[in-house]
């Protein structure tokens, strides 16, 4: 086999392959031999069918498999020899093997761009210190205290006010007819917490326990359910009870009941530790992004189209999932697929640039990712999505997604590796506005 490489672009290669007659005939012979071992034909013992009969009987299957097997062998040899890793699907352009004839075909694929990494050792970067003040801890304790409050019916007969919890029935009507899906019984509404529409809360705040009333409610133009957006309906409400919160004392008993802490002091320490850990991670991630953005401005390279397309698809899919959670579809954005692509393209290109840079840094830093680490990431994905781990892993393997997942883990490790070599200065948080 001989081949000639053509660089179509800095990130795309085309390989013209020529296969001599001897190799063609050997590939066909090997495929026929494989068929002979398993084929069953009347009048012949298994494995004893003459090669010529097997070839004539199963010519289409044999020649197709022989071609595919030979091309796959060549692809492995070529990419190994060139020391490249194809990013995209390898496109094949050629016919099928013919006995006694030379075989020619071409393959094309995208590869990572080649560029020189800037010197990142000692790179100056600032990271904000993680700070937690007592007021924030007090606010957390106050929320815990409030959530554990006892709800007690108010002594007097009065409408609910901010801070109260009202137990009520409600139903929406349009032109005197009930609106399906907009009703509830014994619904608990915390007033003053923006849990419902302002018009609805204002109506509820006029109704004492044991009474009912109705009034117009206008849904906002951006309401999640487009069927009600901007619409005015009649809401009928019956209040069963108005309750106030009886707050527990802030003491060791509250800490024990809230989370099994031995004291309120231990509970406060845990809150501080949790805040510190999350903020340290956040500030580190912010500093890493700042460092990466600056390093990316120091290099220039072409972006593989297939890689950008993959991230465009991912971003649009993320958008679709987010919209569905809000009860809406992508079509509610009023944009064509082309307009959506144009909208997310800059972000997709930036993600691709970052990934390419970090994978190059990962090679320089000899970053490795084990199969156990990949499985661990898949386990987390399976738990978050409620899917079976083996089913999810099989899907990732069959669709080639496992390589993208591994690359993402390599990129994350590479970012940590180059950040560890940076000159990081810890700075005080900016004063609150």
UniProtKB/Swiss-Prot annotation:
Keyword Cell division: yes
Subcellular location(s) per record: Cytoplasm
Gene Ontology CC annotations of this record: cytoplasm
Domain PPIase FKBP-type as annotated: residue spans: 163-248
One GO term of the biological process aspect: protein unfolding
InterPro entries associated with the record: PPIase_dom_sf, Trig_fac, Trigger_fac_C, Trigger_fac_C_sf, Trigger_fac_ribosome-bd_bac, Trigger_fac_ribosome-bd_sf, Trigger_fact/SurA_dom_sf
Annotated keywords: Cell cycle, Cell division, Chaperone, Cytoplasm, Isomerase, Rotamase
Catalytic activity: [protein]-peptidylproline (omega=180) = [protein]-peptidylproline (omega=0)
Molecular function (Gene Ontology), one example: peptidyl-prolyl cis-trans isomerase activity
EC number: 5.2.1.8
Span of the signal peptide: none
PANTHER family: TRIGGER FACTOR CHAPERONE AND PEPTIDYL-PROLYL CIS/TRANS ISOMERASE, TRIGGER FACTOR-LIKE PROTEIN TIG, CHLOROPLASTIC
Protein family: Belongs to the FKBP-type PPIase family. Tig subfamily.
HAMAP family: Trigger_factor_Tig
Domain notes: Consists of 3 domains; the N-terminus binds the ribosome, the middle domain has PPIase activity, while the C-terminus has intrinsic chaperone activity on its own.
Function: Involved in protein export. Acts as a chaperone by maintaining the newly synthesized protein in an open conformation. Functions as a peptidyl-prolyl cis-trans isomerase.
Name of the protein: Trigger factor
Organism: Nitratidesulfovibrio vulgaris (strain ATCC 29579 / DSM 644 / CCUG 34227 / NCIMB 8303 / VKM B-1760 / Hildenborough)
